[in-house]
Regions:
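Surface-exposed, low-hydrophobicity beta-strand/loop segments enriched in small/polar/acidic residues
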Residues: 2-161
Length: 161
């Protein structure tokens, strides 16, 4: 039977958190219409536990501010067409695997949350905010990726019957 040292086991599932912050004044854009992009890399062998979208300040540009969150395989795999101006998230509201807000996409289901938790290779999680219309003077969105990577992995033993 496989054995795992208790001390190692106790510390093997510490969650890790990556925060991506999108702001209307990133990269001296000064709120101009366009696409704001951000990404973070989750290491190989990690399990994604949650991807959250927090609205600190609503985006106030002219026509629209639309957020997608996904990865390199599917840019909107987690969340699609999130209106950052007010209708989908108000200030201090959160989208998460447990509060989908009707914005879930291919990687997330109503029934059981995320479908693609584990990846054997490193995975780039990305977000894009597309703004249209007049220049924004406010807007801050935080995307939180919570993941865990075991420090030990125990494989089963097999004995033929």
């Amino acid at each position: 039977m496989a054995q795992l040292d208790k001390q190692t086991y106790k510390s093997s599932w510490n969650p890790n958190v990556a925060e991506m912050v999108m702001s209307y004044d990133d990269d001296s854009a000064a709120g101009a219409a366009g696409v704001y992009s951000i990404s973070t890399v989750i290491p190989a062998g990690a399990y994604i536990l949650d991807v959250q979208v927090h609205t600190d300040t609503l985006w106030d540009n002219g026509t629209s501010a639309t957020l997608i969150v996904g990865d390199s395989d599917d840019p909107n795999g987690f969340y699609d067409a999130v209106n950052a101006k007010a209708t989908d998230l108000v200030a201090n509201e959160v989208l998460s695997f447990y509060h989908l807000g009707g914005k879930e996409e291919a990687y997330v289901t109503d029934d059981n949350g995320v479908m693609t938790q584990y990846a054997s290779t490193a995975r780039t999680i990305s977000a894009q905010m597309t703004t249209v219309g007049t220049t924004a003077t406010a807007g801050v969105t935080r995307i939180i990726v919570i993941w865990a990577k075991p420090t030990d992995s125990v494989k089963s033993d097999f004995t033929a019957s």
